[in-house]
Structures are given as C-alpha cells and as structure tokens.
Amino acid sequence: MSVAQPRLLFAASGTGGHVFPALAVAEALPEAKIDWLGVPDRLETQLVGDRYPLHTIRVGGFQGSWLLRPLTALRLIGAIFKVRRLLKRQQIEAVFTTGGYIAGPAIAAAWSLGIPVVLHESNALPGKTTRLLSRFCRRVALGFAEAGEYLPGRPLQVVGTPLRSQFYQPSQHGLPIPENVPVLLVMGGSQGAVAINRLVRAAAPAWLAAGLWIVHLTGQQDPDRGQLQHPQYIELSFVDNVAPLLNRADFSISRAGAGSLAELAAAGLPSLLIPYPFAAEDHQTFNARIFAKAGAAILAPQSELTVEQLQQQILDLLRARLGAAIANPLPKMAAAAGKLHVADSAEQVANLLRSLL
C-alpha cells in the first residue's frame, strides 16, 4: 500500500442493501480519503454527505435492450465520462462498489483508466450489473459462496456482507418491554413492506392475546400506520441501529435482503422470511433458501401466505416461549443462524482494497 493517504472512490447507491455495506467498509478504512459516488435523491444523500464528499450522477440500469435505446445509451456514456473526470480530478487509486445501477459507469470508467475495482455482491444470485461487469474488476467479494456459481472465472473471495461498526457496539433499545416476555420483531427492509405490514396487523390480535410482544418496523411509507393500537404492540417507522432490537427479540418476520439476513445472522436470530416478490430476478428468494436450508429460517413465499397461516406458524414456533410444556425449536434455529455470520466481513473487504494500493 502506498505511504501517502490512499484515495478511494466508493460507488454505492439506492437502497440500504447497497449503501450500508459500503459504509461498513468505509469505516474499516480510517486511513483512506474516500469520495462517494451516488445518485441524486437516493438514500446516500441522507447518509453519506456528512461523512464523505458526495458526487452524484444520473444513471439508469441495464434493463431490457438498452443498447437499442439511444437516449439510455447516451446517458450511460455521459455518466462514464463524468466518472472518468472525477477519478482523474480526485486522483483515485482504487474503486469499491456494491453493484446496482451506479456500478456500471463506475466500473467502466475505472477500467478505462486502469484503476483497480473491488466489487461486492451481497446476494446469492448476482445482479445483472455484477454478471456483466465483474470481469472488469480486480476482485469480486461475495456475500454468499453460492453466488460464485454464476460468476465463473472471476477472482472471487467469500467475505459475507459487511455490517456497520455500530451494530457491534453495546446499546439499549430503550423500549418499554418487560424483561422476560417473548418478543417478535417484524422488519420490512430499508424501504418497508406494505404487504408484510398488513399481514402482520391482521394476524397480530391472536399473538397479542397469547402474550407475545411485537416490535414492528413499518418503514416510512406505511399507509396504515397507527391503525393497530395495543400496549404490547410497538410501531416504529425506522431505527438507525436495529442491533439492540435483534438481540432482544426471540424471533423475526423479515424480508430476505442480504443486509437484513446479515443482521439476523449476526444476532443469531431465527426468522420467518417473506422474500420481496418483485425484487430483480426474485433474488431475495435465492437468499432465503440458503437460510432455510441451513435451518436458520422458514421460507414463506408472499403469494402463498395467508393471514391464518402466518398466525398459526408464529404461534407454533413460539408456543414453548409462550409457556407451553413442549420442545422449543428456536435455540436450534438460532445456532444455525449464528453459523452464517462472518464477523470480520468489513475488514476482509478493506484488506482487499489495501492489497490493490
């Protein structure tokens, strides 16, 4: 690694699944000067600007026959040239990206200038951008080993999905939950999940009557917020650090984004996973299958799940925790979840970047 302060460009944009792992890696590189490449009006504009210089470009994805669409192609070419100018102006030595739309111009621009790129793919099914452009990257870091099946011949390293340092720092959830009661944590991902919210609210009365406490992270765009009122039901639109809630909960209902799964694994929390059915190429189902196969979770496709089924599944899984004299399946699931955790993921990716400087 060069003696001078290394200069890096992080290209991560859109959802928490792209931005949060990149922030975790950035935290693991305190010696570096990091510039950030994003898109206007996306999550990174809220999270990154106070920490790193943020540069934004407008860019779309590789959806459909984009080469046949002159306007899309021109925008992409324009974005590549803008990133090239940024790389030269900031004297960038290496680029890190977490995939998604922003990765296209970032990888292309860096490759054209001979600047090495590390790409992190968090999902078990790599995205289209990753499959197309990973051949131009010096290293490809994987959240799941299974993703390597779709990337033959690439310079791969399985590192898990990085979590921000605050996830591992002791803190209190600050909620008025009694010490020994069973707690169900419902998470819809960084963008929320209206379908899950409605299923949970419809099923909740039976859970509450049985003695379960529910902490429901609804997302900020939930149209039904406030409709369910109960002393044991706590509704939050967003929390910056979910770790204290994960550590307090007995079980979780969650989407199956790679970031959420990494958090569940880190906390050793068993779960029922409802993959987002409209995710690109249904990639959340691929993620969920790995957790289900390991015994860490139950996979429940949204299209097949009724309120009655969800209600009964949760009651059955938590029956021992609710006081029934039966075997408790949760400790075995929790142990399986914990085995999927990679504690030094961010440091591994940081070391990949250091090795290229």
UniProtKB/Swiss-Prot annotation:
Query: Which InterPro entries does this entry report, sorted A to Z?
Result: GlcNAc_MurG, Glyco_trans_28_C, GlycoTrans_28_N
One Gene Ontology BP term is: cell wall organization
Query: Among its keywords, does the record have Disulfide bond?
Result: no
Q: How does it sit in the membrane?
A: Peripheral membrane protein
On the tree of life, the source organism's domain of life is: Bacteria
Give the record's keywords alphabetically. Cell cycle, Cell division, Cell inner membrane, Cell membrane, Cell shape, Cell wall biogenesis/degradation, Glycosyltransferase, Membrane, Peptidoglycan synthesis, Transferase
Pathway, per record:
Cell wall biogenesis; peptidoglycan biosynthesis
Q: Which Gene3D superfamilies match?
A: Glycogen Phosphorylase B
Residues binding UDP-N-acetyl-alpha-D-glucosamine: T15, G16, G17, N123, R164, S190, Q284
Major enzyme class: transferase
| CDD domains in the record | GT28_MurG (cd03785)
Listed EC numbers? 2.4.1.227
- Pfam families hit by this protein: Glyco_tran_28_C (PF04101), Glyco_transf_28 (PF03033)
Q: Where in the cell is it found?
A: Cell inner membrane
| Cellular-component GO terms for this entry | plasma membrane
Q: Which GO terms of the molecular function aspect are on file?
A: UDP-N-acetyl-D-glucosamine:N-acetylmuramoyl-L-alanyl-D-glutamyl-meso-2,6-diaminopimelyl-D-alanyl-D-alanine-diphosphoundecaprenol 4-beta-N-acetylglucosaminlytransferase activity; undecaprenyldiphospho-muramoylpentapeptide beta-N-acetylglucosaminyltransferase activity
Catalytic activity, per the record? Answer: di-trans,octa-cis-undecaprenyl diphospho-N-acetyl-alpha-D-muramoyl-L-alanyl-D-glutamyl-meso-2,6-diaminopimeloyl-D-alanyl-D-alanine + UDP-N-acetyl-alpha-D-glucosamine = di-trans,octa-cis-undecaprenyl diphospho-[N-acetyl-alpha-D-glucosaminyl-(1->4)]-N-acetyl-alpha-D-muramoyl-L-alanyl-D-glutamyl-meso-2,6-diaminopimeloyl-D-alanyl-D-alanine + UDP + H(+)
Q: What does this protein do?
A: Cell wall formation. Catalyzes the transfer of a GlcNAc subunit on undecaprenyl-pyrophosphoryl-MurNAc-pentapeptide (lipid intermediate I) to form undecaprenyl-pyrophosphoryl-MurNAc-(pentapeptide)GlcNAc (lipid intermediate II).
Q: Which NCBIfam families match?
A: murG
**Family of the protein in this entry:** Belongs to the glycosyltransferase 28 family. MurG subfamily.
Q: What is this protein called?
A: UDP-N-acetylglucosamine--N-acetylmuramyl-(pentapeptide) pyrophosphoryl-undecaprenol N-acetylglucosamine transferase
Question: Gene name on record?
Answer: murG
